[in-house]
Amino acid sequence: MSITKEFDTITAISTPLGEGAIGIVRLSGTDAIAIANKVFKGKNLETVDSHTINYGHIVENNEIIDEVMVSVMRAPKTFTREDVVEINTHGGVAVTNEILQLLIRSGARMAEPGEFTKRAFLNGRIDLTQAEAVMDLIRAKTDKAMTVAVSQLDGSLKNLINNTRQEILNTLAQVEVNIDYPEYDDVEEVTTNLVREKTQEFQALLENLLATAKRGKILREGLSTAIIGRPNVGKSSLLNNLLREEKAIVTDIEGTTRDVIEEYVNIKGVPLKLIDTAGIRDTDDVVEKIGVERSKKALEEADLVLLVLNSSEPLTDQDRTLLDISQNSNRIILLNKTDLPQAIQTEELPEDLIPISVLKNENIDKIEDRINQLFFDNAGLVEKDATYLSNARHISLIEKALESLEAVNQGLELGMPVDLLQVDMTRTWEILGEITGDAAPDELITQLFSQFCLGK
């Protein structure tokens, strides 16, 4: 997809393919209204008011294809800042595809993935952070993730970054003035103090923003959560309890979970990617052995480990091994089967375990409370009006910007001339511009929009 601004008219189906009540075929571009008017029988779309919905039929060679409602939106007050037409059809693969092909035959071009959002970016309707927020909103798995995405779409991150970049420019301009007009004896000291003060101010701001990354990334991507334990302690039953559906195979036979099962579940606004692992033990079964190896890998990569023990049986060597290999993880120990007489030796276990009964659904809510304690210090997940970093690209760029600011600090400590330190300060300004797209390379922008679905 070329990054250069284009003016041809594009079209795509904007709703998921399949059976449904409504389907939407979208056009955007200079000729969007004229092309739609060619295939629409009803009011003349080229003369109707902007932001109106018009009843009629889509026809080809006087044959009715569908009864539709057509939305006409004139530039610049549209998502793409171009003329936009949305044809609301009856849902279904055949009718939406037929209308799409008719529009292409009438002069439109098939849109590439993300091209509508790309045009909104190129035409200045949104910046790159807002474009990425569109995708985050589509992919949001919980209401909290949706709130963060909507805030970014509304411009919270854009405004913070743009304001910081402007302050950096103001600082650089003041330094230039002081360098160009060195009439005063103390101008060098004043300039050095200014740069030191502003650099520390920018560092504090970006460090505070970076501090939100852990929470933001969890809300966006979820916590990779490995459920581990020896065979038949209730791992799959716990998974099904959290999911509230029979996803894993639950039997009384050891080793029935032979692979890694992954599912998402919403825990108080946090998407947990639950990984039910095969029981970690020595086995001669080839298929089960593969599952065990995958389980060990899942344990290494997990953000959170739920270690399930059987409270109705004494600790085994396998239990002790699992306690040992998971001790450096963010771990919650669960004593399952508390509905049965206790036989486990709790004196060998850490104090912060949670007794549960998956069978009777007892104390499952305490798992959710412990997760909140582990990852969010019992604080609310999303603070009102707060700006969160949740995108790995943004996090990486903020870290690079902080490195450039630290280079300025180090230069000041070494007594380097301020005019030489302008290079690192300018680099900070450029890096922050990559976040919003003001200084992002074409290849990055092209790659970003290619991840979008067709019609968005």
From Swiss-Prot:
Kindly list the cofactors needed: K(+)
Which processes are annotated in GO (biological process)? tRNA methylation; tRNA wobble uridine modification
Q: One Gene Ontology cellular component annotation?
A: cytosol
Question: Which residues of the sequence carry a binding annotation for (6S)-5-formyl-5,6,7,8-tetrahydrofolate?
Answer: R26, E86, R125, K456
List GO molecular-function terms, semicolon-separated.
GTP binding; GTPase activity; metal ion binding
Does the record's keyword annotation contain Magnesium? Answer: yes
Source organism superkingdom: Bacteria
List the cysteine pairs that form cystine: none
Which free-text remark accompanies the cofactor? Binds 1 potassium ion per subunit.
**PROSITE patterns found in the cross-reference section:** G_TRME
Is Cytoplasm there in the keyword field? Answer: yes
| E.C. code | 3.6.-.-
Q: Where does GTP bind?
A: 232-237, 251-257, 276-279
Gene3D superfamilies reported in the protein's UniProt record: P-loop containing nucleotide triphosphate hydrolases, Probable tRNA modification gtpase trme, domain 1, tRNA modification GTPase MnmE domain 2
Sequence ranges assigned to domain TrmE-type G in this UniProt record: 222-376
Task: Please provide the record's keywords in A-Z order.
Answer: Cytoplasm, GTP-binding, Hydrolase, Magnesium, Metal-binding, Nucleotide-binding, Potassium, tRNA processing
Q: Where in the cell is it found?
A: Cytoplasm
So where does K(+) get bound? N232, T251, I253, T256
Query: Which family is it part of?
Result: Belongs to the TRAFAC class TrmE-Era-EngA-EngB-Septin-like GTPase superfamily. TrmE GTPase family.
Q: What does this protein do?
A: Exhibits a very high intrinsic GTPase hydrolysis rate. Involved in the addition of a carboxymethylaminomethyl (cmnm) group at the wobble position (U34) of certain tRNAs, forming tRNA-cmnm(5)s(2)U34.
Q: What binding partners and quaternary form does the record give?
A: Homodimer. Heterotetramer of two MnmE and two MnmG subunits.
Protein name in UniProt: tRNA modification GTPase MnmE
